[in-house]
């Protein structure tokens, strides 16, 4: 158990402090940079910072869930989702830098809270563990859809990243469903949405 904790601590430090790396090509690599106005660039930066913070939260959530998952298939589903979230971290982090910004200063706070939630979800049992994965990815997918509408129309690079992230998240939700994810109670879903609203509002600015 101590080895597991050390491994997860190392993952956490790398998530928060080290540049992320993608095994796949960046979705925007062949797309030219648009000539955005200062206001458009600022807005795109805020949205991509929100998306990066969301991926930090996802990493922590899945790490916490994997620590307490009992079933091998559930652990593998969480591992696979977490690996793709690392790629999302790399994509959004680079885009933030290209837009002239930096990641949210609140990332450590959100990481800690998400890790605790992940551990708690895993303790409840694998069907609820997968249920949290399924609902998280559904909500993130809907959130990314809203960003596709909100991003500047000419910012094709950010839009390509967000579109691929959305497709990945929905695949994760479907994978969790196929593995027997439980449907979370409505109050839990509402609490998750409220938490996400606070996170998005704060990380857009800070």
From Swiss-Prot:
GO terms for biological process: ubiquinone biosynthetic process. One of its GO terms (molecular function) is metal ion binding. This is 3-demethoxyubiquinol 3-hydroxylase. PANTHER family: 5-DEMETHOXYUBIQUINONE HYDROXYLASE, MITOCHONDRIAL, COENZYME Q10 BIOSYNTHESIS PROTEIN 7. Its cofactor is Fe cation. The gene is coq7. Keywords: Cell membrane, Iron, Membrane, Metal-binding, Monooxygenase, Oxidoreductase, Ubiquinone biosynthesis. Pathway: Cofactor biosynthesis; ubiquinone biosynthesis. HAMAP family: COQ7 (MF_01658). The keyword Oxidoreductase applies. Fe cation 2 binds at residues 85, 137, 169, 172. Its EC number is 1.14.99.60. One of its GO terms (cellular component) is plasma membrane. Fe cation 1 binds at residues 55, 85, 88, 169. Belongs to the COQ7 family. Catalyzes the hydroxylation of 2-nonaprenyl-3-methyl-6-methoxy-1,4-benzoquinol during ubiquinone biosynthesis. It is a peripheral membrane protein.
């Amino acid at each position: 158990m101590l080895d597991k904790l050390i491994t997860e601590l190392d993952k956490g430090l790398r998530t928060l402090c080290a540049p992320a790396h993608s095994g796949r090509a960046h979705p925007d690599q062949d797309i030219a940079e648009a000539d955005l106005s200062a206001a458009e660039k600022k807005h795109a930066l805020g949205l991509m910072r929100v998306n990066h913070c969301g991926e930090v939260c996802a990493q922590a959530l899945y790490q916490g869930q994997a620590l307490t998952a009992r079933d091998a298939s559930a652990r593998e589903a969480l591992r696979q989702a977490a690996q793709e979230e690392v790629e999302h971290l790399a994509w959004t982090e680079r885009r933030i830098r290209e837009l002239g910004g930096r990641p949210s200063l609140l990332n450590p706070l959100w990481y800690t809270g998400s890790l605790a939630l992940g551990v708690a979800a895993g303790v409840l049992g694998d069907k609820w563990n997968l249920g949290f994965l399924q609902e998280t990815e559904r909500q993130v997918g809907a959130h990314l859809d809203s960003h596709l509408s909100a991003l500047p129309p000419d910012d094709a690079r950010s839009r390509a990243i967000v579109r691929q992230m959305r497709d990945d998240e929905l695949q994760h939700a479907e994978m969790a469903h196929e593995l027997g994810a439980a449907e979370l109670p409505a109050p839990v879903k509402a609490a998750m949405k409220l938490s996400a609203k606070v996170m998005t509002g704060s990380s857009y600015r800070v």
